């Protein structure tokens, strides 16, 4: 009986340790993904095409797709061009993270704000995304404004 208790104790201790390790790994993943989303927002705020491309190279899969109510592009270079056009229309504006990054099963969601050069917020929205096998963004689907209320 004593031996069975010892075995049970060891199994429970190993199970608790495995859960703690999994939680620590999930938290590390969340920190890494949050850092990546910050860089993605920085790319949306970077007027210099070369620096913007460097940021996108770090966070965006080569064949990644971006879709919002006004745009649908595939590939890093096309996303960079879309951002460049946005920044030409609204110089000095930036996109900032407005929520914690929610992450599960290689899916992300986060809220953002579009801040004009004068510091005023002109729009808020939410993006939903998928991560590629290498951890970079493979897909973003963006929505503008708050959710639509029920009739």
Model-derived features with residue positions:
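Bacterial N-terminal signal peptides
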Residues: 7-17
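Short beta-strand edge/turn micro-motifs at domain boundaries
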Residues: 124-151
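A solvent-exposed, acidic/Ser-Thr-rich amphipathic alpha-helical stretch
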Residues: 51-106
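Boundary at the C-terminal end of the N-terminal hydrophobic targeting segment
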Residues: 22-26
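Positively charged n-region of N-terminal signal peptides that target proteins for export
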Residues: 1-5
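Short beta-strand segments that buttress and anchor functional surface loops
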Residues: 110-117
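Short, surface-exposed coil-to-beta transition loops
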Residues: 95-96, 109, 121-127
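Short acidic-aromatic low-complexity motifs
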Residues: 30-59
């Amino acid at each position: 009986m004593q031996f069975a208790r010892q075995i049970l104790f060891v199994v429970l201790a190993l199970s608790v340790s495995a859960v703690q390790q999994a939680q620590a790994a999930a938290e590390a993943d969340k920190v890494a993904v949050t850092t990546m989303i910050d860089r993605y927002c920085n790319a949306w705020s970077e007027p210099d095409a070369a620096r913007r491309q460097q940021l996108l190279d770090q966070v965006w899969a080569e064949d990644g797709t971006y879709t919002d109510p006004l745009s649908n592009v595939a590939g890093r270079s096309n996303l960079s061009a879309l951002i460049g056009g946005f920044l030409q229309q609204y110089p000095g504006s930036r996109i900032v993270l407005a929520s914690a990054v929610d992450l599960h099963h290689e899916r992300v969601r986060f809220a953002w704000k579009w801040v004009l050069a004068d510091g005023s917020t002109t729009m808020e929205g939410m993006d939903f995304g998928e991560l590629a096998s290498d951890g970079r963004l493979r897909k973003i689907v963006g929505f503008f404004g708050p959710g639509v209320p029920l009739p």
